[in-house]
Swiss-Prot record:
Keywords: Isomerase
Gene Ontology MF terms in the entry: ribose-5-phosphate isomerase activity
Protein name per UniProt: Ribose-5-phosphate isomerase A
Any single GO CC term annotated in Swiss-Prot or TrEMBL for this entry: cytosol
Family per similarity comment: Belongs to the ribose 5-phosphate isomerase family.
SUPFAM superfamilies in the record: D-ribose-5-phosphate isomerase (RpiA), lid domain (SSF75445), NagB/RpiA/CoA transferase-like (SSF100950)
Catalytic activities: aldehydo-D-ribose 5-phosphate = D-ribulose 5-phosphate
Length: 234
């Protein structure tokens, strides 16, 4: 009888990033809880540390999904109304410039809440796997803009004047555009990001734009690899 070959199960590199990020979470901290698949892994593992090790922290969620995840895993929640400054925020990213550590976020449409909470933190940690690292920001990923619905046409016109390539993000499971947790639309735009700090400001200066997905205030990026995690700092 032929012997079956053992199937090797590859570890998720993101879990190595998550476990490294958890080392920075201490008792008594107020923690910003990011959104997205990698951030969800962090929320799940943080919940385990609370239930199994008695870690005493409070979370501030950045989206409906992260709130539901935190409740599911028993993370006590507070709001920015109670704490205007957080000790730390841990979030994922769609693209990370491996030299500058500037990132693009917002593939899930939550970047407005994410930026508010992430930028309120004393320390912002981004957790990713190696596939999210790029040499030049915006290589493969457009910058998302959350836009007031009645202003989408004027915002598109302003973006075209900036030699960019904008498009309204359309929904997969319903007719019409994607609608954010805040009731707004999303415009995705490919634009020159040689100076992301300046573009971040320029995009937000367009009337009707609520927030954009360029994040330039990252303190650490933790890159999960198959056998370890690497910490990148500015």
């Amino acid at each position: 009888m032929a012997r079956k070959k053992a199937v090797k199960v590859e570890a998720d590199p993101r879990l190595n990033a998550v476990n490294e990020a958890l080392k920075f979470i201490k008792d008594g901290m107020i923690v910003g809880l990011g959104s997205g698949t990698t951030a969800n892994l962090f929320i799940a593992e943080l919940g385990k540390k609370i239930s199994e090790e008695g870690l005493n922290v409070f979370g501030v969620p950045t989206s409906f999904e992260s709130r539901m995840m935190a409740i599911q895993y028993g993370i006590p929640l507070v709001s920015l109304d109670e704490y205007g400054e957080l000790d730390i925020a841990v979030d994922g990213a769609d693209e990370v410039n491996k030299e500058t550590l500037n990132v693009i976020k917002g593939g899930g449409g939550c970047h407005t809440q994410e930026k508010i909470i992430d930028y309120c933190a004393k320390e912002l940690i981004i957790i990713v796997d190696e596939s999210k690292l790029v040499d030049s920001l915006g290589e493969n990923t457009p910058v998302p803009l959350e836009v007031l619905p009645f202003a989408y046409s004027s915002v598109l016109n302003e973006l075209l004047k900036m030699n960019s390539a904008p498009s309204i993000r359309m929904a997969d499971k319903k007719m019409g555009p994607v609608i954010t947790d805040n009731g707004n639309m999303i415009i995705d735009v490919f634009i020159d990001l040689n100076n992301p700090e300046e573009v971040e400001k320029q995009l937000n200066n367009i009337p009707g734009v609520v927030e954009n997905g360029i994040f330039t205030k990252v303190d650490k990026v933790i890159v999960g690899k198959s056998d370890k995690a690497e910490i990148l700092k500015k």
